[in-house]
Swiss-Prot record:
Protein name, per record: Na(+)/H(+) antiporter NhaA 1
Subcellular location(s) per record: Cell membrane
Family statement: Belongs to the NhaA Na(+)/H(+) (TC 2.A.33) antiporter family.
Entry keyword set: Antiport, Cell membrane, Ion transport, Membrane, Sodium, Sodium transport, Transmembrane, Transmembrane helix, Transport
A GO MF term: sodium:proton antiporter activity
NCBIfam families in UniProt: NhaA
Catalysed reactions, as listed in the record: Na(+)(in) + 2 H(+)(out) = Na(+)(out) + 2 H(+)(in)
Membrane topology: Multi-pass membrane protein
GO annotation terms (biological process): regulation of pH
Gene: nhaA1
Organism (species): Nocardioides sp. (strain ATCC BAA-499 / JS614)
Keyword Magnesium part of the UniProt annotation: no
InterPro entries: Na/H_antiporter_dom_sf (IPR023171), NhaA (IPR004670)
Family annotation (Pfam families): Na_H_antiport_1 (PF06965)
Gene Ontology CC: one annotated term: plasma membrane
């Protein structure tokens, strides 16, 4: 009796119907948030380059908050430290769900986004460093071009009407999730100027109480929100960037249901509650306060782009991300003898890698941490992030639009449900073959 010939592993496979549906729901929410982000950033850039630019700077630098608690922060700092903690809380929920019940639970499926994210971090950082070996503190910004802005990316997909097939959409989201984990690790390890261990130890108390409550499936807002706020204040006072508190709180929330049944757990429940606040308010407001840079016309743009810091950011996002993600994916396929999923080509991988070069929100945050908000070098970083993200958008649009007809056919196949049982036929065939 002849044994069945083993099949070669497939990259960018579509996964289960439940996981694909969850990814589609998340990307729809991120699309709305991304459009708001783009609108907020556009308003900020236009305002900062009008005769009324001083009023924009005055608003960004307006201080509010109790001075006795060291929380008399500017509105820009509140957006970066406070509102982005909400964004990273959602990222923490996503990360834990992916590792416990999602694609990252399976080492074989996790290998691709993890390797691609690491390549997409290492190569842009290397490109930036090569531009800035001259010293004078510029190397502090090495991590700026390592981030991917998923909300911005999927908003661009919506604007250009590209129908990405499920495998590519899932990869893009999972890549962004791993990217967020790497970004918050970098922020915690490399952008902590001073550390106050007493405050850090004190922060463990509300974090532990929060964890105990959610592990017991107690999720009353009047209990959890004050604990989360207390943890945020203490982490902020410790010297660690306060957004780290958001990730730690997200990690504390259980993913699986306490009754052992399938279905959404507390992490997914909180994600549905908080994501609209993150995508619809936190990230756009941060973008509004972070993106406004006075360019100074064409001469100012040329001056900013003559700075190796800006050049390192632009080439890191445009070239580094593409080479890092596509190159590491090719190496993984070569060493594991894997094939791309049917009807996909390496052009698709390159287009997606270009799209990942849109590094907006976290790149701007790291730029502020590296060089200080409002400094001349931070302004050059903003110009670099904007130019690099726009260039990555243009290149990705050209490649992905070229493949849009093929994508549309794939999406039509993935949506066919001949037996009208609510599950597209292609997923049932995949399950039978698996």
């Amino acid at each position: 009796m002849t044994g069945r010939r083993p099949t070669r592993p497939r990259l960018f496979s579509r996964g289960s119907f439940l996981e694909s549906s969850r990814v589609a729901d998340i990307l729809r929410a991120e699309t709305t948030g991304g459009l708001l982000l783009i609108a907020a950033a556009t308003v900020a850039i236009v305002w900062a380059n009008t005769p009324w630019s001083a009023s924009y700077a005055d608003l960004r630098d307006l201080r509010v908050g109790p001075q006795a608690w060291h929380l008399d922060l500017t509105l820009g700092a509140w957006a970066a430290d406070g509102l982005l903690a909400i964004f990273f809380f959602v990222a923490g929920l996503e990360l834990k769900r992916e590792f416990v019940a999602g694609d990252l639970r399976d080492p074989r499926r996790a290998a691709l986004p993890v390797v691609a994210a690491m390549g997409g971090m290492a190569v842009p950082a290397l490109v930036y460093v090569l531009w800035n070996l001259g010293g004078d503190g510029a190397l502090q910004g090495w991590a700026i071009p390592t981030a991917t802005d998923i909300a911005f990316a999927v908003a661009i997909l919506a604007v250009i009407s590209t129908h990405l097939p499920t495998g590519l959409r899932t990869f893009l989201l999972t890549l962004a999730v791993v990217d967020d984990l790497l970004a918050i690790t970098i922020i915690a390890l490399f952008y902590t100027d001073e550390l106050h261990l007493g405050y850090l130890a004190a922060a463990a108390v509300p974090l532990l109480v929060f964890a105990l409550l959610v592990q017991r499936r107690i999720h009353r807002g009047w209990l959890l929100i004050p604990l989360a706020a207390t943890a945020w204040v203490l982490v902020h006072e410790s010297g660690v960037h306060a957004t780290v508190a958001g990730v730690l709180l997200g990690f504390a929330v259980p993913v699986l249901r306490s009754d052992g049944q399938e279905g959404p757990g507390l992490a997914e429940h909180l994600e549905h509650l908080v994501r609209p606040l993150s995508a619809g308010l936190a990230v756009p407001v941060f973008a509004f306060f972070a993106a406004g840079v006075t360019v100074g016309g064409f001469d100012g743009l040329v001056d900013a782009l003559s700075d190796p810091v800006a050049l390192g950011v632009v080439t890191g996002l445009v070239v580094g991300k593409t080479v890092g993600i596509a190159g590491s994916t090719w190496l993984l396929a070569t060493f594991t003898r894997a094939d791309l999923d049917d009807q996909l080509s390496w052009v698709d991988v390159v287009g997606l890698a270009m799209l990942a070069g849109i590094g907006f929100t976290v790149s701007l945050l790291i730029g502020e941490l590296a060089f200080g908000s409002g400094t001349p070098r931070d302004d050059h970083v903003k110009v670099g992030v904007l130019v690099g993200s726009l260039a990555a958008t243009a290149l990705a649009t050209g490649v992905l639009r070229m493949r849009n007809r093929a994508y549309r056919r794939l999406v039509e196949i993935e949506e066919q449900d001949a037996d009208a049982d609510g599950v597209p036929d292609v997923y049932q065939r995949d399950a039978d073959e698996g």
